[in-house]
Design a protein with these regions (language model features):
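Beta1/beta-strand and adjacent pyrophosphate-binding region of the FAD-binding site
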Residues: 5-19
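Glycine-rich loop(s) and the adjacent beta-strand/alpha-helix scaffold that form part
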Residues: 26-29, 33, 40-56, 266, ...
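Conserved N-terminal glycine-rich FAD pyrophosphate-binding loop of Rossmann-like flavoproteins
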Residues: 41-66, 96-108
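Short, solvent-exposed loop/turn and secondary-structure capping segments
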Residues: 45-49, 107-109, 116-121, 225-227, ...
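Short, glycine/acidic-rich hinge or "gate" loops at secondary-structure transitions
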Residues: 45-48, 163-184, 494-505, 581-589
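Conserved redox-cofactor binding core of oxidoreductases
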Residues: 60-62, 68, 72-74, 85-92, ...
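FAD cofactor-binding and catalytic pocket of flavoenzymes
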Residues: 78-95, 99-102, 106, 110-126, ...
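A glycine-rich dinucleotide-binding beta-alpha-beta segment and adjacent secondary-structure elements
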Residues: 216-219, 238-239, 278-283, 429-440, ...
Length: 589
């Protein structure tokens, strides 16, 4: 079949989630002709908006808005001596698909990392003596300062209508917020969400024990909000269907609610769904791209010429597309040469579930980000060097959903039949959780590459993930177990269960952790150790920009979306202010 060549555009955007929609609208506002290609289908709000009922089985069990492994499987192994096997069912992580991507079904915790997280290598060099940390750890600084990136955090938070309590306003510490956060130029756009009973209980005990709890920063908006693009987001009504669901009430910031409503009305923007990009096509000099090849909904292979190519798919698939396209040298863990695939990182979770016969937490009345957390156990805020590990966690009590199938039940409760129904009737609404979301460092032998054995439905190699837990992350888990246990003891439940990784634990792909995968095409100052410069521009192909979690050199305890938004907006500004005037490398190697 002959290839169909499309009309050339200024910018082609591959993937229409948070990064893709933000890059599209910013460049379209600058007057560029922007064409977006989305592998999945359209996700118009009419598909799931009120009065249609939320469907727990469809969304939370059958993963209605997630990609299927048949479309985008990866292969996984613990180490390079093993043969990786493909994922047949999502477990530890679950990427989205279609317009909105993972930004449609996210929990909407919108939190910044700390300045120490941004300059983690600098902190390690100052605080850790040689020999304390594993010698295969590969920590890096982000290639920008807090002062450079902070305005873009605030811009993204205005786009989302971020709700929360300010803790550090231009260096002044304010009561009720996070005293460890980096200085903010402006307060949170909106006040925090209301607390649920578990939040009140957790806050009281955490404060008593000397910690500094504050409300979860949220992109489920607490008040009606009109953002800088002119989009209106409705106040959250605490419906209880949030994490893994599109918002039925138009109250959760997503690409649909915060960006697409305005973007779709722009005459210089267009998008095509069910369009799977399979390769970035390079010019003969291999220093510039001339467009992308994709398969359309009818099965035709199409070529979309463009002056600028933006890869804005989910983190794993940005890395795969770079490898398939020959953009950047693939990483070799033996020689440590190459950059595409290195510094992959995930995260771990865990915590305690507490049961109280005499308390009703009314879990049906909640938002995804409803909760209290504290940041005392993050790098630089406690004595990690004396404990022999690097990293930390946000420790929180959140009530992200109140749906019955996901309800926690005491140990020994049957998982099916009459006993399950009786247990659900007895215990629904009588439990709360204390949870951890941890950092994860990058390592020499943890990486992504193309699998030599397994191909996708188009005959292209699957992405291969080589990943397992390291001693550093397991030491962190054990330290957090003691902290969470002390808080739980003070709360005095009737019974409880705890879940933490023991020393020696292997990565379990079957149990959900988070969709906070990062790294693989990281940003940095050195083209020998990073695939992208500070503006997410490929060091090797200067008209290719790659926004997303792939740019993180390691994972911090903060959820990644705020940073993905900020670095995307900073890159878009650099394209508008610098690249369009003088196309070429924005940072000299």
């Amino acid at each position: 079949m002959a290839q169909v060549t499309k009309k050339e555009v200024d910018v082609v955007v591959c993937g229409l989630g948070w990064a893709g929609s933000l890059m599209s609208i910013e460049l379209a506002l600058a007057g560029l002709d922007v064409r977006a290609l989305e592998r999945g289908g359209d996700r118009d709000y009419d598909e799931f908006a009120y009065p249609k009922p939320a469907d727990e089985y469809a969304y939370a069990v059958r993963n209605k808005v997630f990609a299927t492994p048949a479309e985008v499987a990866v292969t996984v192994r613990y180490n390079s001596s093993q043969t990786a096997l493909p994922t047949r069912k999502w477990g530890a992580f679950a990427p989205g698909t279609g317009v909105g991507g993972s930004g449609l079904h996210w929990t909407a915790v919108l939190i910044r990392p700390t300045p120490t997280d941004i300059k983690l290598k600098t902190y390690v060099d100052e605080a850790y003596k040689p020999g304390i940390l594993q010698d295969d750890m590969r920590v890096m600084d982000f290639p920008f300062s807090w002062e450079e990136i902070e305005p873009y955090y605030y811009k993204f938070e205005l786009i989302c209508g971020q709700s929360g309590n300010t803790g550090n306003l231009r260096g002044k510490i304010l009561e009720g917020g996070d005293p460890f956060e980096g200085p903010r130029s402006e307060p949170y756009p909106l006040p925090a969400l209301d607390d649920t009973l578990n939040n009140v209980m957790f806050k009281e005990v955490a404060t008593k024990l000397g910690y500094h709890p504050f409300p979860n920063p949220s992109a489920c908006v607490s008040r009606a909000w009109k953002n800088p693009y002119g989009n209106q987001i409705a106040p959250c009504n605490y419906c209880g269907y949030c994490s893994k669901y599109p918002c039925l009430n138009y109250s959760k910031a997503s690409p649909q609610t915060a960006v697409m409503d305005s973007l779709k009305r722009m005459p210089n923007f267009s998008y095509e769904v069910n369009a799977e990009v399979i390769k970035v096509v390079l010019n003969d000099d291999k220093k510039t791209a001339k467009g992308v090849s994709y398969i359309d909904a009818q099965g035709n292979e199409c070529f979309q010429p463009a002056k600028i190519v933006v890869l804005s798919s989910f983190q794993l698939y940005n890395v795969r597309l770079m490898l398939l396209s020959g953009i950047g040298k693939p990483y070799n863990p033996i020689t440590e040469e190459g950059v595409v695939g290195r510094n992959y990182a995930f995260l771990s979770n865990g915590g305690a579930t507490l049961f109280f016969k005499d308390k009703n937490f009314n879990p049906y009345a909640t938002a995804g980000a409803t909760g209290q957390m504290f940041n005392d156990i993050s790098p630089g805020n406690f004595d990690g060097p004396s404990l022999g590990f690097l990293g930390g966690a946000k420790i929180h009590s959140s009530q992200a959903t109140g749906t019955p199938i996901s309800t926690a039940l005491p140990k020994g409760t049957p998982t099916w039949g009459m006993g399950y129904k009786e247990g659900l009737e007895e215990w629904y609404g009588h439990s709360m959780k204390i949870s951890i979301t941890t950092t994860c460092q990058s390592y020499r032998d943890i990486y992504l590459d193309l699998d030599p054995n397994y191909n996708d439905h188009r005959g292209l190699p699957l992405l291969r993930m080589t990943f397992n837990w390291k001693e550093n992350e397991l030491k962190l888990q054990q330290h957090l177990k003691g902290i969470v246990g002390n808080i739980a003891k003070e709360l005095n439940p009737d019974s409880m269960s705890m879940s933490f990784l023991p020393m020696g634990a292997d990565f379990d792909l079957t149990k959900y952790v988070s969709t906070h995968n990062v790294g693989g095409a990281v940003m940095g100052d050195n083209p020998k150790t990073s695939a992208l410069n500070k503006y997410l521009q490929s060091w090797d192909v200067h008209n290719v920009f790659v926004p997303g979690g792939n740019a993180f050199p390691q994972n911090f305890q903060a959820n990644p979306t705020d940073t993905i938004g900020a670095i995307t907006l900073m890159a878009a500004q650099a394209i508008k202010d610098q690249y369009l005037k003088n196309p070429g490398p924005l940072v000299q190697a």
